[in-house]
Swiss-Prot record:
Consequence of changing L70A: Strongly reduced interaction with PLCB2
InterPro entries: P-loop_NTPase, Small_GTP-bd, Small_GTPase, Small_GTPase_Rho
Residue list for modification (Microbial infection) O-AMP-tyrosine: Y32
Keywords: Cell membrane, Cell projection, Cytoplasm, Disease variant, Glycoprotein, GTP-binding, Hydrolase, Intellectual disability, Isopeptide bond, Lipoprotein, Membrane, Methylation, Nucleotide-binding, Nucleus, Palmitate, Phosphoprotein, Prenylation, Synapse, Ubl conjugation
Modified residue annotations for Phosphoserine: S71
Reported impact of K184A: Slightly decreased palmitoylation by the V.cholerae toxin RtxA
Organism (species): Homo sapiens (Human)
Maturation propeptide residues: 190-192
Crosslink feature (Glycyl lysine isopeptide (Lys-Gly) (interchain with G-Cter in ubiquitin)) location: K147, K166
Protein's job: Plasma membrane-associated small GTPase which cycles between active GTP-bound and inactive GDP-bound states. In its active state, binds to a variety of effector proteins to regulate cellular responses such as secretory processes, phagocytosis of apoptotic cells, epithelial cell polarization, neurons adhesion, migration and differentiation, and growth-factor induced formation of membrane ruffles. Rac1 p21/rho GDI heterodimer is the active component of the cytosolic factor sigma 1, which is involved in stimulation of the NADPH oxidase activity in macrophages.
Protein name: Ras-related C3 botulinum toxin substrate 1
């Protein structure tokens, strides 16, 4: 059985741990608990192939900036997460997470994941953002960011309702099992 190491990164409180707990136990956890590395392992079937999916949680807080990369070696796929209702966490995909991941693992596939999908249409959440002159992140914005950072896929999910949750991990596995073809630059020799 093929083993795949999937590391989840992103700002603190975007829902990385909830994503993993909800996926592995089918239950949404209660209050917020900041993480320092938890590992989960799940045997799953994707496209008829059995896979041992090793899920590595990380702490997004700056205090762990020097410790976090210790979990990066031998990673097969990264999930870079941001909250759809936190524009700051979305901006940090470009400013922090993509550069950090690429620095340590230049060729590892990335899946960009927008979390807390259930809150994007939540009236109270929209109102709180509006007070700060902010709005939730839209699907096209997420897609554009994924293209900008060269992510294999852009996906949105809710750990609370589990909408889109299984797809995130299925696509992470597919990114490893069926990597997209590398576009070769055609070298043309021009004589003038």
């Amino acid at each position: 059985m093929q083993a795949i190491k999937c590391v989840v990164v992103g700002d603190g409180a975007v829902g990385k741990t909830c994503l993993l707990i909800s996926y592995t136990t089918n239950a949404f956890p209660g209050e917020y608990i900041p993480t320092v590395f938890d590992n989960y392992s799940a045997n799953v079937m994707v496209d008829g192939k059995p896979v041992n999916l090793g899920l590595w949680d990380t702490a997004g807080q700056e205090d762990y900036d020097r410790l976090r990369p210790l979990s990066y070696p031998q990673t097969d796929v990264f999930l870079i997460c941001f909250s759809l209702v936190s524009p700051a966490s979305f901006e940090n995909v470009r400013a922090k997470w993509y550069p950090e991941v690429r620095h340590h693992c230049p060729n590892t596939p990335i899946i960009l994941v927008g979390t807390k999908l259930d809150l994007r249409d939540d009236k109270d959440t929209i109102e709180k953002l509006k007070e700060k002159k902010l709005t939730p992140i839209t699907y096209p914005q997420g897609l554009a960011m994924a293209k900008e950072i060269g992510a294999v896929k852009y996906l949105e999910c809710s750990a609370l309702t589990q909408r889109g949750l299984k797809t995130v991990f299925d696509e992470a596995i597919r990114a490893v099992l069926c990597p997209p073809p590398v576009k070769k630059r055609k070298r043309k020799c021009l004589l003038l």
